Structures are given as structure tokens and as C-alpha cells.
């Protein structure tokens, strides 16, 4: 499979390509790279995976060689090559140059280059080193305008009063990514039919209410057209937060009169109200409707900024106060953004912005899916996942209230909040290994330093990243690889039977030895070592010393993770967590995920300045999310 982020890697390679011919680059830089890092496993004496690289030519006209080059490109991009067993590893700059050279040469040969960096789940393919490089902070933002559906809550608010059995804009579960992302959801014919039915039901009720106002205006001397226009203006403000243009008003009045003539009053007003709801502007979020500057960039209008900020922090369209604030020409858009963000975060009566922060952590740590992981009830322990999720929600909110070193606290805290009533009813204190005589308390419960540490050892997270009947170190390691280390793992090939042997007398570590086969371990080497330390807990999230009457092995060795301070031998989950919590790289990766959640897209190199400023603000404010 040939893939690459054309905008990032090719932009790095093209300036060099203007100075050196492809053959010279191949001879001077690509061949030495292959010889140093690849030929020992893919040369004349050994061909792992039946791949040989020492006899490749710079030309990509041969189809078989082009396929090998594309596989090499993928392996370097996902840091599969060289393997973790290698003695030498290339620098990031060396790897980027070879990636750029392969991508450019493939394209010159007329081969398609699939762009993945803009797709959901592939944001880590954009170079982390470049995103946080001072040189890249001067690059202009180079992203396409976003277009995506409004949130389910926004649709429900728009058609309030209509009975919604199933919201057609319902979001998928995160599955490791974020639920709402630009371009993630299509708008199909079934969805259009459902939205139309909701719009008609809502408009029928609203039109009847509007008739009362129209009758009142008529009694005060208004002409029928004036009264109808006033009703349309009010509904426009309620739904779209603006007044209709002259052309829009003329079209809607024509529709009203036509339907009234054919079906009678107030069917015309009902049709107009439904038409307002069914406008693309009501159902989708648009950007970039203004004029481009001399460099081709389009700045968001003040109204677009208001809509973007409101959806980012509340998942709803902007309220009247926000729209009025952005109409203030005496303030710059940046100052208004800061002021309105502060207003929403400080709003105690409607703490929607704080709930939105909770939603980010729910999707980032992906622990709500614990409720979807079926577990057998076993003697002496009654599993109740919703209460565990509630506990972790409470811990996140408790941390956000303090708003100091938020990520580090969530990764390393020894204090958990245990929801008393539900756990007393369902027996969940046992999952925390609390003693039988434990006295419930609304205060945080402090655990011994050798038993629990932060979210990654919380029962809710452990259950969410487990199977129905066993632990899943692969899934846990994959989460760490993506969400904290900021790297990637290739998609599972369609011909792979991802299944462990069913041997009830073997420990999970022993059963996982099948993943050490050469064709498997190039990917599993990036997940298994990160997930194995969490074998300290069973798949219910209970702390343990033994597995199948054998001492549980929680040691691991991390090699070439991309984060040097994380590499090395680890003796358990706490040592691994502390290394990641103290890593600047992991903190920067966290900032990248915050960016993706609130902007609804992956970052590009043009966002380097924004990300660097966001990370600096986080540091300067002592790890504050509000900063």
C-alpha cells in the first residue's frame, strides 16, 4: 500500500530535490541509509519478509520494485524499520529525508500517493519534531476549510418540541479516536428523511404558536405580509441566530403564499419554518466563505469565529451574548475569543464548557467503553462498570477544579474518588482491593504507592482496555503508543488471524508468544512491551500478585519508542507511568490531542506555531487546562 502525507513530507523533500538529481540523492543519502539500517535484515544473506533492498534502483519504473519502495516507505513512517532489535537507529532527519525522497520519486513515476495525515486516526503521521521545531513556527497555516454536521445536541435543540425517537445525528463511539471530527459522518437519504420529519413536526407546533403573535400584530394594525415577515424573522433568529437577507425573505414569502393558497393557513408558515430548519446552514458547520488574501488564505469571519468557538466549548451554536460580543468592532477577534472563552469557563449556572472538558478526557482516555465490555459475574465479586466510569468522571472533574498539572496529576495521582452508594449496592469496593471494613467517604481515597497510580491503573480504564474474559496488553499498549508517545502502528493486514491460543493453563504472557513471530512482531513490538506491565491487574481491574497460581510478570523492556526518557527496562506499571508523566514529549503529544478534539481536525505543519504557543501556555500556567 502506498501512502504519505503529501503536504508535509513532499514539502520537505522538494527544496532538496531542486538542488540534487534523484540519482545523486539516491547514491549520496538513500543508499547509505539502506546500507546502515536495513541491509543486515534485507540484503543478500538474509531477506526478512522476503524483502531485499540492496539491489533496488533509484528508478521506480519497475512495478515490483515500486511496490517494495512503497512498503519501505510505510515501514519507515510507522517506525517499523529498523526493528527494535537493531543496534543502530536513524535520526528523525535521516528518516524524513528518505521518506520524502521515496514519496517524490514514486510520484514522478506516476504512482498514486495516498494522503492519510488528514484522516481521523492518522494525525500522528505528521512529524512531532517539526511541529515543535522553532523553524516551523514561521510557516503559514495551510488547511482546508472544515465542513461537518452539527452535534446531536444542536439538532435536538433546533427541533425541540418534536418527539425524537432516535437522533439521526447520533455520534459513533470513539473507538480510540474522537467522536466528532470533520468529514467523519455522511448525510445520506435516510438521515435526510428523518431530519425532514423532525423539521415538519417541529414547525407544525411553532407555526401554531406564531399564529397567536400574527393575530396580535394584525389587531395592532400590521398588514398580513408584515406580520408574516416578523414571524419569519423571529424564527430565523431562533434557528440561525441572524436576520434573513432580502432574497431569502422574498423566497420564503413566496413559498408561504403558495402553500397557503393550496393547503390553507397556517400551512404556509409551517412550510417556511421547516425550510429554515432544512437549510444547510442549520445542519452543517461551514468555514471560509470570505475572500482570500494575496497568499490565498481565507480568514474566518467574526460570525464563523463565534460559531467555531461556541461549538468547540459547548457543542452548541453561539448564544446571543457571544454573537453580540463578536460584533464589537472596537475589540480584535483574538481579544474577543479570549474574553468569551473565559466567560464560558466561569459560567457556574451553565457549566457546559467544563462538561466539554470532561468529554475530552472521556474520549482521550477512552474509558467510557468499560460499560460495553461484558464481564461474567464471579463468586465474591459483582462487577458494575457504570459505577467505575462514574468514579473516573469524578476524578477528572476533581482534577479540573484544581487545574494544576492536569495531565501529570491524572497519570500519577494516588487519590481516587469512590462513589459510595452504587458500590455498596453492587460490591465494587472489591475491585479497588479495599478492605471489608472500609468506611465509605465522600473524600478522595488515598491508595498505597505500590497499588494504584492515576487513570492507567484505574479499574474503569483497565476494564475499557480489556477483553470479555481476559486482559488485553495489546490494546493497552496501542493506547499508550498513540495517545502518549504520539506514534503509530500500521493497520492490521486483512489476512492476519489476530487470535491468541486458547490454553487455559498458560499465563497470558506465555500465550502472547505467538505474536513474536517475525511477521507479527514488527507491529507487536510497539504495543506488547507497553501493555505487559499492566498485568499487575486482572481484567476486572483488581490488583494481583499471581496469575493461575504463578507470580505475575510485570517487567518489560522498551526500545526505540521515540521518547528516549521512556526507553529501557521497567519493573512494573508505576515506573512506566512516571517516565511518561515526566516526559516533555508526552506532554506535547497531549497538547496535540487537545488541538484535535477542539478543532475537529488533525494538525498540519502550518499549526506548529499554535501548538508551540499552546504548550508554552500550559507550562507557564503550571499545567492548566484553562490556559
Task: Spell out what each predicted region is.
Residues 1-12:
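Bacterial N-terminal signal peptides that target proteins for export
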Residues 11-21:
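Hydrophobic h-region of N-terminal signal peptides that target proteins for export
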Residues 20-216, 237-238, 242-254, 258-262, ...:
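Aromatic- and Gly/Pro-enriched helix-to-coil junctions and flexible linker segments
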Residues 21-71, 75-92, 96, 444-573, ...:
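Sequence context surrounding c-type heme c attachment/ligation sites in exported
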Residues 97-101, 111-114, 121, 125-227, ...:
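Extended surface/linker regions that mediate inter-domain or inter-protein docking
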Residues 247, 285, 297-306, 310-359, ...:
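Extended, well-ordered alpha-helical scaffold/bundle regions in very large, multi-domain proteins
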Residues 250-263, 325-333, 338-348, 381-383, ...:
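Amphipathic alpha-helical segments that form the core helices of the histone-fold
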Residues 267-269, 280, 320, 353, ...:
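Loop/turn elements at helix/coil->beta-strand transitions in domains of secreted/extracellular proteins
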Amino acid at each position: 500500500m502506498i501512502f504519505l502525507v503529501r503536504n508535509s513530507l513532499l514539502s520537505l523533500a522538494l527544496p532538496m530535490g531542486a538542488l540534487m538529481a534523484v540519482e545523486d540523492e539516491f547514491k549520496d543519502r538513500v543508499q547509505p541509509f539502506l546500507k546502515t539500517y536495513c541491509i543486515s535484515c534485507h540484503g543478500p544473506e538474509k531477506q526478512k519478509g522476503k524483502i531485499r533492498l540492496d539491489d533496488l534502483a533509484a528508478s521506480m519504473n519497475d512495478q515490483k520494485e515500486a511496490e517494495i519502495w512503497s512498503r519501505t516507505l510505510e515501514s519507515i513512517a510507522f517506525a517499523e524499520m529498523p526493528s527494535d532489535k537493531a543496534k543502530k537507529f536513524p535520526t528523525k532527519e535521516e528518516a524524513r529525508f528518505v521518506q520524502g525522497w521515496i514519496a517524490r520519486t514514486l510520484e514522478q513515476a506516476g504512482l498514486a500517493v495516498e494522503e492519510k495525515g488528514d484522516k481521523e486516526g492518522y494525525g500522528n503521521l505528521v512529524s512531532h519534531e517539526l511541529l515543535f521545531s522553532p523553524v516551523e513556527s514561521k510557516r503559514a497555516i495551510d488547511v482546508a476549510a472544515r465542513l461537518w454536521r452539527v452535534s446531536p445536541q444542536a439538532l435536538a435543540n433546533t427541533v425541540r418540541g418534536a418527539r425524537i425517537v432516535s437522533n439521526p445525528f447520533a455520534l459513533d463511539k470513539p473507538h480510540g479516536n474522537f467522536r466528532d471530527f470533520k468529514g467523519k459522518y455522511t448525510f445520506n437519504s435516510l438521515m435526510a428523511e428523518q431530519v425532514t420529519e423532525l423539521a415538519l413536526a417541529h414547525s407544525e407546533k411553532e407555526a401554531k404558536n406564531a399564529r397567536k403573535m400574527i393575530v396580535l400584530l394584525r389587531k395592532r394594525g400590521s398588514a398580513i405580509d408584515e406580520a408574516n415577515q416578523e414571524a419569519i424573522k423571529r424564527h430565523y433568529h431562533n434557528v440561525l441566530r441572524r436576520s434573513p437577507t432580502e432574497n431569502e425573505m422574498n423566497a420564503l414569502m413566496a413559498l408561504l403564499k403558495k402553500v397557503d393558497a393550496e393547503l390553507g393557513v397556517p400551512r404556509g408558515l409551517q412550510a417556511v419554518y421547516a425550510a429554515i430548519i432544512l437549510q444547510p446552514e442549520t445542519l452543517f458547520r461551514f468555514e471560509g466563505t470570505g475572500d482570500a488574501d494575496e497568499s490565498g488564505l481565507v480568514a474566518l469571519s467574526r460570525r464563523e469565529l463565534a460559531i467555531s468557538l461556541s461549538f468547540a466549548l459547548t457543542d452548541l451554536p453561539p448564544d446571543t451574548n457571544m454573537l453580540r460580543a463578536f460584533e464589537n468592532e472596537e475589540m480584535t477577534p483574538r481579544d474577543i475569543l479570549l474574553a468569551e472563552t473565559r466567560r464560558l469557563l466561569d459560567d457556574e449556572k451553565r457549566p457546559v464548557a467544563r462538561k466539554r472538558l470532561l468529554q475530552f478526557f472521556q474520549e482521550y482516555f477512552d474509558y467510557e467503553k468499560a460499560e460495553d465490555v461484558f464481564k461474567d459475574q464471579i463468586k465474591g465479586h459483582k462487577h458494575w462498570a457504570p459505577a467505575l466510569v462514574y468514579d473516573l468522571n469524578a476524578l477528572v472533574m476533581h482534577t479540573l477544579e484544581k487545574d494544576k498539572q492536569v495531565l501529570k496529576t491524572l497519570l500519577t495521582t494516588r487519590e481516587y474518588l469512590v462513589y459510595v452508594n452504587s458500590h455498596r449496592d453492587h460490591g465494587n469496593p472489591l475491585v479497588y482491593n479495599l478492605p471489608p471494613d472500609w468506611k465509605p467517604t465522600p473524600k478522595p481515597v488515598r491508595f498505597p504507592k505500590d497499588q494504584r497510580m492515576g487513570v492507567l491503573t484505574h479499574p474503569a480504564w483497565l476494564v475499557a482496555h480489556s477483553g470479555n474474559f481476559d486482559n488485553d496488553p495489546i490494546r493497552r499498549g496501542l493506547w499508550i503508543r498513540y495517545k502518549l508517545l504520539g506514534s503509530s502502528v500500521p493497520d492490521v493486514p486483512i489476512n492476519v488471524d489476530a487470535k491468541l491460543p486458547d490454553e487455559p493453563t498458560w499465563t497470558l504472557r506465555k500465550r502472547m508468544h505467538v505474536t513474536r513471530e517475525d511477521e507479527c512482531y514488527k507491529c507487536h513490538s510497539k504495543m506488547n512491551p507497553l501493555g505487559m506491565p499492566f498485568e499487575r491487574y486482572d481484567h476486572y481491574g483488581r490488583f494481583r500478585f499471581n496469575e493461575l497460581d504463578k507470580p505475575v510478570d510485570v517487567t518489560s523492556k522498551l526500545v526505540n519508542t521515540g521518547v528516549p526518557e521512556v526507553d529501557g527496562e521497567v519493573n512494573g506499571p508505576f515506573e512506566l507511568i512516571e517516565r511518561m508523566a515526566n516526559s516533555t514529549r508526552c506532554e506535547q503529544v497531549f497538547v496535540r490531542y487537545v488541538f484535535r478534539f477542539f478543532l475537529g481536525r488533525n494538525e498540519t505543519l502550518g499549526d506548529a506555531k499554535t501548538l508551540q504557543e499552546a504548550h508554552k501556555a500550559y507550562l507557564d500556567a503550571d499545567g492548566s487546562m484553562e490556559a
